From Swiss-Prot:
Pfam family for this entry, one: FBA_3
Protein name per its UniProtKB record: F-box/kelch-repeat protein At4g19930
Keyword vocabulary terms for this entry: Kelch repeat, Repeat
The F-box domain, residue ranges: 37-83
Chain positions of Kelch repeats: 143-189, 227-275
UniProt key word Zinc: no
UniProt xrefs under InterPro entries: F-box-assoc_dom_typ3, F-box-assoc_interact_dom, F-box-like_dom_sf, F-box_dom
Family matches, as NCBIfam families: F_box_assoc_1
Amino acid sequence: MAFSFDLAVIFQRERRMKRKSRVTIRRRRRRDMCKSHEPMPYIPFDLVIEILTRLPAKSLMRFKSVSKLWSSLICSRTFTNRLLRVPSFIQRLYVTLTFLDNSLQRKSKLLSSSSSPGSDISTMSSFVVDRDLTTPSMKGYYLSHVLRGLMCFVKEPSVKIYNTTTRQLVVLPDIEESNIIAEDHKNKKIMYRIGHDPVGDQYKVVCIVARPNDEFGELRRYLSEHWVFILGGDKSSGWRKIPCPSPHLPITQILSINGRMHYLAWVQKFDPMLVTFDFSSEEISILQAPEDIRWFKSNPIEYYGKVALLNLSDLKRECTMNLWVMEDVEKNMWSEKTLVVHPSQMDIVKSTSLRVAGTTRNNEVILVPHNIRYTLTGEVIVEPQNTTLLYIFLYDLQKNLMRKVEIKEPPYHTKFWDVVGLDDVENFMYL
């Protein structure tokens, strides 16, 4: 018994000595590392950038607080441009909802739905609403469009720009020098558009102000002004007026592609012209639109990197769409083709009014149920949708195939809903 007790004491003492020895070794190693003058392994700057570009946006926003160096790096134009070159596999669909709350007050919500990373939108059957982007500062404003992660909110004549990644919101100054904005004209039109200048690597906001010319005997049918504001620049510079060769009145939505924006407009007669604004040179050019095109329900779209015009005038009646593609800008050459909806989908287009809301990166046209009608006096009336189920159609112009994509799990049930469009860029630009 005594022998067993002595043996246990010896074993316990040995365990203590071994434990103490391991602790001593760890402390000695730590002390030697502190005394060592060998430099830490060098990580190339390009590799640091490459690692950071693979991180999600939330992580990068947290890393801005690590140090001033990290903050300046993440907010730098070089890093932002590097992120834009990294292909994103998440396409977000932006949806607006209007409904009455429990106190019968009208409320508006801005939601975005995201696909799963790595999913292919060409085979998707649904989007899932998972983000509420509504903020009190947006109250009274409507979302005009989204470009490269930048949202444009308008409440004429005011405009706000919101970065969906950094959650930064800026209010642009009023255009006090505009003669048309200051006028109280019932047919006055104000349009804003965000664009990117690839030469100067700047984001700019263009404001188009126009109205009919009511003075009898004047040769000019319309009065218009173009103003430009540089985002992230010197705030004291403000808005700059851009000369326009011919006053005109925009009649369609605006397409931004390859550093330019395009839209149809009336210049003198009611024949539509294609107006192009170059974000780099800040020059405006006006080209003749295809002779046989009808401006009503015509929208500029991107068609495999080219400017195209898609007309839906005959979609509901004849189940056809007309597509014009600009093949040569210098010669103003257009190609035309008529698309006939597949027989199995004719009932859909005959029973539903649709409008164009842009294109996907796979060149599918986004078609949204249309619930807006115009009175004879030009008044816009928004009617409720036929259902509280949210959905869009994606139309492949080359394959001539249309498919329905549902928008699932909206947090509010309402027939007043609309889709702004798709965007798949995370932008860390400081506004």
